[in-house]
Amino acid sequence: MRQVFIVPDLIGEPLDEAQGALQSLGSQSLDPQDASGLGRSVSIDGVWRVCTQSPKAGEVVDVRTVVILAAVLSGERCP
């Protein structure tokens, strides 16, 4: 039987909390990216805040689906 989960709305969440939420649902693959376009290395901690996500909230996906979270440093505006 295929294992799936419903993608939660992670926009505005600290990146570490977003990762925890995904892992609790069974997600096995996360790709954090710098939403600013500056190509900075993104660490999974509370210093980064999620701006966009793919797949979108509400989509039903396989646990092996790569979830892309584009984030900016806390205090920065999302592009």
Write out the residue ranges for each language-model feature.
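Ligand-recognition elements built from short beta-strands and adjacent flexible loops
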Residues: 1-79
